[in-house]
Amino acid sequence: SEVHAFTMFDNFYGSGGRIFDTAYIYNNGMGDKYLGQWINSRQLEKEIIVIGKAAHTPQCEPQFIRPQILESLERLQIKKLDIFCLHRDNSEVPVAEFIDALTEIKEEGLIDLIGASNWELDRFSEARAYAFKEKKEPFKVLSNNFSLAEMIEPVWPGCVGVNDAYMEYILKEEILLFPWSSQ
């Protein structure tokens, strides 16, 4: 409910939290809506960072990214996402198609930093290599599972964790890691 969401957001913000992670699919869009209402009611758009995600399975294709971002922005009542991550990967789609779509959306001013959530290291690094080669916008953010407990089996289909090789890459390439973990 809105009351429950506002209470959680107020407690998080009051404890110093300034980064809010949301996604197009969370609670059928109500996650975005409640967060947007809270941001607007507290006039905090310039005080916080919003991480948004879209293109979750089965709509994990480039043509779904922009419309889902626009719908999320409307729900959130903000003009742009500070950070945007593709929510899942679709290995049947060339990384170039994702990077090209995200570069266009960034050039429109709808997102600042781009990244990926639940992408394997080979695809993530391939996407960055393509972006640098073609002078496109590279992934600068990763939001994979990472915690003190190693994920043996994915919590949900398509989830990817950060292993030692991935961590070496993240550190070497100076990727911002916004991990998630089941609770």
Model region roles, listed by residue range:
Residues 1-12, 60-76, 97-100, 124-129:
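Short, acidic/polar
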Residues 19-26, 85-86, 112-117:
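Short catalytic-loop micro-motif centered on adjacent basic/acidic residues
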